Amino acid sequence: MRVVFAGTPEPAVPSLRRLIESANHEVVAVVTRPDAVAGRGRKVTRSPIGLLADEHGIPVLTPVKASDPDFAAELARLEPDCAPVVAYGNLLPQNVLDIPKYGWVNLHFSLLPAWRGAAPVQAAISAGDEVTGASAFRLEAGMDTGPVYGVMTERIRDTDTAGDLLGRLAENGAALLESVLDGLEAGEINAVPQSADGVSYAPKVTVDAARVRWELPARTVDRHIRAVTPAPGAWTMIGDLRVKVGPVTVTDETLAVGEISVRKDGLYIGTATTAVRLGQIQPPGKKLMSAGDWARGARLDAEVRAQ
């Protein structure tokens, strides 16, 4: 099958790599976001998908907008049988969706119709879901509403950060995506409309939304921090200092909401239920470090609170 792959960030890499190595499919081009300025050095950086394509000599298309007529013309010239998509990051107009013979097959990291949107992994952890997964579905104009070809499930571990879980979903979802393309080519697979029940949404997590709310129960605080780790990163104010915080451990200790207790094994902060132990913290301009060591060095006043 002639394939044009669309994707941008690191979680899309396992799927592209698997298709490149597949004996059944030929990746004739890759579509990714344009090179962007990133990092402290403000260097122009190629996307992970663009870099992988370059390694294998695969042509790379980087339209600023997928509605660009030149992009549609180039895509049509390639005559793709199918266009798999993993976290591409651009909306595709209908004339572009109509070009591949089998359409665009999107790998979405949730069990649709649950958690449609930009942050399904973060939403599943934050909500306390025990199981999530990935869905391969036919892309259409609506947001993650297309009929589903297949799913795979993944149990959410008690210590999973969004980065941990996304890594497993990206690897296991790649196998699902390849099997769906195999089934489409063989005429052995059909898409099933999504249920109207169980629909939920997962909008992009903003930096403001990543702030820790210590007035919530300890388990909720724990899930929230893991859900926004590594990006955009959980943060809080300690006094007048804004710091990023790493995952926490729920304890049986009792402290007032936002109250801080510095101990040998870390920094304890009170929530609406019990205290949580914070192992690592990242002050402004610094690397991640031991929260206890930082607090002892900072010599926090007794009345200082996390908020």
UniProtKB/Swiss-Prot annotation:
GO MF term set: methionyl-tRNA formyltransferase activity
Keywords assigned by UniProt, alphabetized: Protein biosynthesis, Transferase
Binding site for (6S)-5,6,7,8-tetrahydrofolate: S110, L111, L112, P113
The keyword Lipid metabolism belongs to this UniProt entry's keyword annotation: no
Bridged cysteine pairs (disulfide): none
Domain of life: Bacteria
GO cellular component: cytosol
Family: Belongs to the Fmt family.
Known function: Attaches a formyl group to the free amino group of methionyl-tRNA(fMet). The formyl group appears to play a dual role in the initiator identity of N-formylmethionyl-tRNA by promoting its recognition by IF2 and preventing the misappropriation of this tRNA by the elongation apparatus.
Record's protein name: Methionyl-tRNA formyltransferase
Phylogenetic classification of the source organism: Bacteria, Bacillati, Actinomycetota, Actinomycetes, Mycobacteriales
